[in-house]
Amino acid sequence: MTDALENLRQHLSDELGATLRTAHLDRGELTVELSREGFPAACLLLRDDVACAFDLLVDVCGVDYSAYGEGLWEGPRFAVVYHLLSLKHRQRLRVRIFADDDLPIVPSVVEVWAAANWFEREAFDLYGILFDGHPDLRRILTDYGFVGHPFRKDFPLVGTVEMRYDADQGRVVYEPTRTEERVVVPRIIREAGEGRYNARNQ
């Protein structure tokens, strides 16, 4: 399998040229990073080229890399990751494309893989990543009046409003939260020399 993925990596390097930024093979998985400029054409090649034949889009997800690696990440904040499957060659491929930090926009792949429709809407809803050319880019999981994108790492942990169904009005209403603002994070404080990982206890 590794030989086949190595051949695929070389083929993609030959065919995609400058569009292919990196191709990393690790633990039997090939991950490629593509540039935004050549991304739509690269997706068509991944689907239609007989040596690739990635006809099945398994998943699309957004990623927020802020504070990644305990704050050591210096690359772009947002990325979109596509997981592809070639039924013909029985191979998987992970494709990553980065977006701008201030206004994250990447090209939509709905025209290439129709299954991307709801996945891209989910990434928009949860991360605020825009997909240029998407036929119906609107929220899919949160309420239409929801403010913000809850999977962003800077999204507040404590809300200021709560919603409930009001039977008299026959709709969901928003009200200021009545709970005390606090963040409950489990903390374990041990005395020196206490705990199962102490040298005395081994």
UniProtKB/Swiss-Prot annotation:
Keywords: Cell inner membrane, Cell membrane, Membrane, NAD, Quinone, Translocase, Transport, Ubiquinone
Entry annotated with the keyword DNA-binding: no
Entries under InterPro entries matching the protein: NADH_DH_suC, NADH_quin_OxRdtase_su_C/D-like, NADH_UbQ_OxRdtase_30kDa_su, NADH_UbQ_OxRdtase_CS
Any GO MF annotation of the entry: NADH dehydrogenase (ubiquinone) activity
GO cellular-component term (any): plasma membrane
Pfam families: Complex1_30kDa (PF00329)
Enzyme Commission number(s): 7.1.1.-
Enzyme superclass (EC): translocase
Subcellular location: Cell inner membrane
Reaction equations catalysed: a quinone + NADH + 5 H(+)(in) = a quinol + NAD(+) + 4 H(+)(out)
PROSITE patterns linked: COMPLEX1_30K
Membrane topology: Peripheral membrane protein
Subunit description: NDH-1 is composed of 14 different subunits. Subunits NuoB, C, D, E, F, and G constitute the peripheral sector of the complex.
PANTHER family in UniProt: NADH DEHYDROGENASE [UBIQUINONE] IRON-SULFUR PROTEIN 3, MITOCHONDRIAL (PTHR10884:SF14), NADH DEHYDROGENASE UBIQUINONE IRON-SULFUR PROTEIN 3 (PTHR10884)
Primary role: NDH-1 shuttles electrons from NADH, via FMN and iron-sulfur (Fe-S) centers, to quinones in the respiratory chain. The immediate electron acceptor for the enzyme in this species is believed to be ubiquinone. Couples the redox reaction to proton translocation (for every two electrons transferred, four hydrogen ions are translocated across the cytoplasmic membrane), and thus conserves the redox energy in a proton gradient.
UniProt family annotation: Belongs to the complex I 30 kDa subunit family.
Name listed for the protein in its UniProt record: NADH-quinone oxidoreductase subunit C
Gene name as annotated: nuoC
